[in-house]
Amino acid sequence: MLVLEQTKELALKLRDPDKVTEMVSGSRVTAKGATIVPHTVDAVHKLRGIGINAPSPILHHYGWPSKYTPYNHQRLTAAFLTVNPKALVLNEIGTGKTQSALWAADYLISVGEVSKVLIISPLSTLERVWGDAIREGTNNRQPVILTGT
């Protein structure tokens, strides 16, 4: 598998390209036999559903907006979150789970996969941890904090 970063596509060498071209819209087979697939979250979900372990597009097509440079484990956590709709992050304390989740959410919003994100948190961490992280860790996102019982 080859990631074509310029065109935001994946090049695959498959025994049965018809299975992929029928399932993933915008995919095609080249004259040399490579199957070209759009490198999108939706396409990755479909490919993984048939056993092709395609990488998350966030790893190749995201600018990581933040005053912080992400560590590799934070990139991998954000990638995991973008391709696993039901996920639980159990990384150690202080490893950047909050920022990884925000990068994943920011990416999914920027590519139109989701429109809003709901964060439920104890009041003690809502403003100072999540609010600050959203303001500092994304270029154009603003939190709206609601409290109540």
Model-derived segments and spans:
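SF2 helicase/translocase NTPase motor core
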Residues: 15, 19-30, 52-79, 83-86, ...
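Interdomain "pre-motor" coupling segment immediately N-terminal to P-loop NTPase/helicase cores
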Residues: 4-54
